[in-house]
């Protein structure tokens, strides 16, 4: 192999590595984490307020002054049994981000905005450091602020990391995660527990949390599982226009819907503005918004839901952002065009999407 060939091969390998390298995830206002959540407590009974089956939790960082302020979607029942939907604010102070011993996994409409001694999207820096450096740590969590604290010991499964796929700004990236398991205890109940942690220097993130049934062992079918499936944050460049120009098809990242509904969540507003701005300057002619679902539910239900979600995006773009209605068509494809397997929680979440395609091709 000549020196020129060697140099060329090295350059190609470096370029390929750069394409798959995980981008730095900022901890700043405007960053949005989308978490797929699955509850299956059919064998033990569903606690009040907990949605059964798949749902999504959308958490935006809104402020990083003196800690981290979150704005999270809520869909469920309040303490009085009334069904509620809205935004829940949660503040984690800088001190708690550093040293808190309890992680609150969920965001409930009845919860106070700040709870001393607790973290939110991930364990504290101190808990994470103990796990990474010593291989073991004491860990506690609550599902919501008002729920009981469940505690135990987490042990790192190996000295290395495992790869965990996440869509970051629409691009599939494999993040390096620290894996830990343990048996956590509440009273006489013991539950197997697993967590995968992104060891972020500013804010460790629980990429996956799962626990099994009472007195269950490993491996286990989760009663509860939560996985980060998307991370969206503002970037430079017009990715929508670039995607249309290249492939005449682009997935609209940053559009989030209420559980089993076509109601667009408030955290979608920044994405809607970006889409409208891109389309107003795009040379493309007529465009079609296409809705897609997972395979949970009947074919008819999924067809109707996907069509209603595409219509909802069109309505928002026309009503709130001044796009011409005749330029936008809509279609619903239900579960028929998956991009990933429907056999996993993350795969089903990624199949629930809206795409924009050129209608004249």
Model-derived features with residue positions:
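Beta-strand/loop-rich accessory regions of lumenal/periplasmic or secreted enzymes
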Residues: 93-150
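Extracytoplasmic
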Residues: 175, 204, 252, 284, ...
